[in-house]
Amino acid sequence: MNMDTNDKEKKNEGIDPAKLKQLNLAVDALEKQFGKGAIMRLGDGSAVMQVQSISTGSMTLDFALGVGGLPRGRVAEIYGPESSGKTTLALHVIAEAQKEGGIAAIVDAEHAFDPSYARKLGVDINALLISQPESGEQALTIVETLVRSGAVDVVVVDSVAALVPQAELEGEMGDSVVGLQARLMSQALRKLTGAISKSSAVCIFINQLRDKIGVMYGSPETTTGGKALKFYASIRLDIRKIAQIKDGDEIVGNRTKVKVVKNKVAPPFKSAEFDILYGEGISAMGELVDLAVEFGVVKKSGSWFSFGQEKLGQGRESAKKALREDHALFQQVYIQVRELMTGTAEIING
């Protein structure tokens, strides 16, 4: 008798044999009708699924998400104020998916996609699928078709606020359209979520913030498109600018904070901070310096940074420059930080 049979017998101890027989018949019938895996015991080896993910392009955010990035087969929402880095973050996810040989698509409902900026962030423009739909229904049908194909790794919808229902487009200016978009999103996500969960795709919805009228207590901010996306999203990321980055008097980027507001695959409410530089995106060097100091790989004494016996320079910018110019040094620091992060992540996630 093999181990699997022994395990099954242990799990079935105490269950009425007649009930067990009826259960097995029901499971067989369901699998015949809907396919293998339609229903399974959570304790079975076949049911234990490792959460695969796609990197966000930020080591700190990947760490905060608990699974090394955005989980595949799930819906993610990235929201925040205007010009906070929502699209930049989504483009980094696309670039990371393409680096792994994946296929990515962007549904540009805002009709504002900038190919030259995406290229600077590492996106392969020639391989990227892009659609600029005329209505919300068309946009969400395109998303569903791409996901059901099973060939796409990342689909980005930019943005929920721009998903205008067909009825609103065909109506007159000033017509009452209360709840139309929320209803559209609710219907679409009911269909989409099942299709996405059976695929290896990450579906990212970029969303904007609006102010709720007449709110006296609590946050007056809310996202567009109703409550369906909040419910169906496995990951919700709140992205904000917290400071400007200056080179002398010139503003060259923003210090950005991302809070994991919702996480169904790991502990939520963690946050990540990193630099987004204009024309470059997430600053990998700046992030590595910050993490190296945090994990004790790089020592900071006053304003001086050092790695072992080697001085990297005075000030954060000098340390970044030293890592950028010495690839072997960069690799050493990166590997040590990565090992410490992975070890810490395993301890935290138990």
Swiss-Prot record:
It comes from the Bacteria. SUPFAM superfamilies: P-loop containing nucleoside triphosphate hydrolases, RecA protein, C-terminal domain. Pfam families: RecA, RecA_C. Keywords: ATP-binding, Cytoplasm, DNA damage, DNA recombination, DNA repair, DNA-binding, Nucleotide-binding, SOS response. PROSITE patterns: RECA_1, RECA_2, RECA_3. Its main location: cytoplasm. One of its GO terms (cellular component) is cytosol. Gene3D superfamilies: P-loop containing nucleotide triphosphate hydrolases. CDD domains: RecA. GO terms for biological process: DNA recombination; DNA repair; SOS response. It is found in: Cytoplasm. ATP binds at residues 80-87. One of its GO terms (molecular function) is single-stranded DNA binding. Belongs to the RecA family. HAMAP family: RecA (MF_00268). Can catalyze the hydrolysis of ATP in the presence of single-stranded DNA, the ATP-dependent uptake of single-stranded DNA by duplex DNA, and the ATP-dependent hybridization of homologous single-stranded DNAs. It interacts with LexA causing its activation and leading to its autocatalytic cleavage. This is Protein RecA. It comes from Chlorobium limicola (strain DSM 245 / NBRC 103803 / 6330). The gene is recA.
